[in-house]
Amino acid sequence: MPKIDLFNQNGEKVGDLQLADSVFGVEVNTYAMHQVVKALLANKRQGTQSAKTRAEVSGGGIKPWRQKGTGRARQGSIRAPQWIHGGIVFAPKPRDYRMSIPKSMKKVAMKSALTSKVNEKLMVVVDDIKLETPKTKEVVKMLNSFDAKKTLIITNNAEENVYKSARNIEGVQIIPVNNINVYDLLKYDKVVITKDAVSKIEEVYA
């Protein structure tokens, strides 16, 4: 069963935390993570791109000049792709990019992402993060104590003061545990997570 250091928000070690082997100690499945990230990014695409092909552009029904005798290259239509305002070759059309991923694969990918962060010592567990008033300086101080720059902060509840304090820090994103996804876990170099959020993850994914 993986064991990880437990810190307070001042960066001081206050104990150890046993992590569930079934969530934070699984065999990392890179294929599952790749598929889930690919699906997440694909599902964000609008798919509204559109351009006209040669057949759809207006005009160009008449030959611009006769075939021979002008000294110029032969042309059949002013809407051919080589002309300005001509049609687009293989023009993009609106399409649905959505991918569906089995729930079991999503679960495997999430566990793999969490395990990889623990294995690479890129996860920091904090007993709690509390601020009486929004203070960006306090969050920066906490992150500096963990040598965390490009960081994902995961809390059990959307603590308003903490959220307001972290939202303007470059390279830092703060989300409630209910909104975690594989892409964000892999995108950020380090994960700072509260003890309660860890318990919530184990409750859902164990």
Curated annotation (Swiss-Prot):
Lineage, uppermost ranks: Bacteria, Bacillati, Bacillota, Clostridia, Eubacteriales
GO molecular function: rRNA binding; structural constituent of ribosome
Family under the similarity heading: Belongs to the universal ribosomal protein uL4 family.
Protein name: Large ribosomal subunit protein uL4
Listed GO CC annotations: ribonucleoprotein complex; ribosome
Function, as annotated: One of the primary rRNA binding proteins, this protein initially binds near the 5'-end of the 23S rRNA. It is important during the early stages of 50S assembly. It makes multiple contacts with different domains of the 23S rRNA in the assembled 50S subunit and ribosome.
Species of the source: Clostridium botulinum (strain Okra / Type B1)
Keywords: Ribonucleoprotein, Ribosomal protein, RNA-binding, rRNA-binding
Pfam family membership, one: Ribosomal_L4
Cited InterPro entries: Ribosomal_uL4, Ribosomal_uL4-like, Ribosomal_uL4_dom_sf
